[in-house]
UniProtKB/Swiss-Prot annotation:
It is found in: Mitochondrion inner membrane. The keyword Membrane applies. The keyword Protein transport does not apply. This is NADH-ubiquinone oxidoreductase chain 1. The gene is MT-ND1. It comes from Cyclopes didactylus (Silky anteater).
Amino acid sequence: MFLTNISCLIIPILLAVAFLTLVERKILGYMQLRKGPNIVGPYGLLQPIADAIKLFTKEPLRPLTSSKLLFTIAPTLALSLALTLWIPLPMPHPLANLNLGMLFILAMSSLAVYSILWSGWASNSKYALIGALRAVAQTISYEVTLAIILLHSNLFSGSYSLSSLITTQEHIWLIIPSWPLTMMWFISTLAETNRAPFDLTEGESELVSGFNVEYAAGPFALFFLAEYANIMMMNALTTTIFLGPTYNPTFPELYSTNFMLKTTMLTISFLWIRASYPRFRYDQLMHLLWKNFLPLTLALCMWHTSLLISLTSIPPQT
């Protein structure tokens, strides 16, 4: 039964990820006044299936000087962690309703750093290693603000469980009282998932595609799937924390529809940003976090904490 539950979670995610690649190529195409994929199947709808067949039937080449074990483990670990992150998300019922769901997501997203680092180091290529070090520095840095903003949402909901956020947002979305945090969270999720304009790990001109430069065929496809699964997961988490869909026990399907629509809109905005903005310089990326986001999030954290303490002695207005 448990295996059925897991497969019912994993298969739709992988299908959504496959078609997200098509949506991205279509959006980028239309924004550049061209069609995008339109040959394979009607309107190019079978393009993801053709891509999957092509990638998984090619021979997975490996550099002779690479570390065989780590080179193989890294993409598998990346996809496994990307799928594990979906476990505590309420849609409206999570696969496992964890009391510390927020901390679980934070810990799992931190572990994703290892797959990037191992892939860069095991490739035994200086381009891959520099790309991996960039990615690790960027991911670890932006996790700081993500953790502080998660602490804010914990202050609002009074629990580390993600399911409690549904109850918290019955009357008002958290985006309204905490819109500066939401903006910083959204930009931090862009950086955390290595998306444009923060995709410095893939600097084609200087790093030749970054940490996955030596990967081909199946292992490359696993990294690709992990990246897009992380994008969708981060947007699903943003929806849960700041745009809480209304849960009606008599119509639980409405929650799922609402949740999926909001997640889709946020994901399309990710793609829109990629098509619109140029890449940041590395020092600008780090200055944005350490000199702007970190002081702001800490100040807002102190403000929200002190606000709760200062209002505790005030009687309720009945």
